[in-house]
């Protein structure tokens, strides 16, 4: 892996850092949107409701934390392979935790509204992709 990182072009390194910065910007904008959404006050942060928390937590998990995880080997390789691997695993674990919390809030929101679950293509595809992601994470932890 070290040889691969050493062979990276400058543009690849810049693209990795730029993707990390852009994911942070998306996270800030998502948090701003969630805190200014006036669709209810049932959440734990004032302006957030359970449905808004779902969106913000999914953004944090699948946009920010996942981007940090997949770019960690290229960005943190100067600190050594072991450090980069720890950072990589940490961000994937944060992603799993945020996605699980987001799923809790959307299920809670649907229960409070007395709506059905898994009633759209978005929910089925999301659940399928989350299951694949969790399975991959679990298999890496086990092996």
Residue ranges, per PLM feature:
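Membrane-embedded alpha-helical bundles that constitute the cytochrome b-like, heme-associated redox core
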Residues: 1-143
């Amino acid at each position: 892996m070290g040889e691969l990182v050493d062979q990276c072009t400058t543009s690849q390194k810049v693209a990795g850092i730029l993707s990390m910065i852009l994911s942070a910007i998306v996270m800030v904008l998502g948090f701003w949107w969630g805190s200014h959404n006036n669709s209810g006050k049932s959440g734990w942060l004032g302006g957030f409701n359970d449905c808004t928390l779902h969106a913000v937590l999914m953004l944090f998990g699948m946009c920010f934390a996942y981007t940090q995880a997949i770019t960690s080997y290229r960005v943190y390789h100067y600190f050594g392979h072991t450090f980069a691997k720890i950072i990589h695993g940490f961000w994937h674990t944060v992603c799993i935790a945020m996605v699980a919390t987001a799923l809790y809030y959307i299920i809670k929101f649907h229960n409070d509204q007395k709506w059905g679950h898994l009633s759209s293509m978005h929910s089925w595809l999301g659940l399928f992709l989350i299951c694949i992601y969790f399975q991959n994470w679990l298999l890496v932890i086990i092996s």
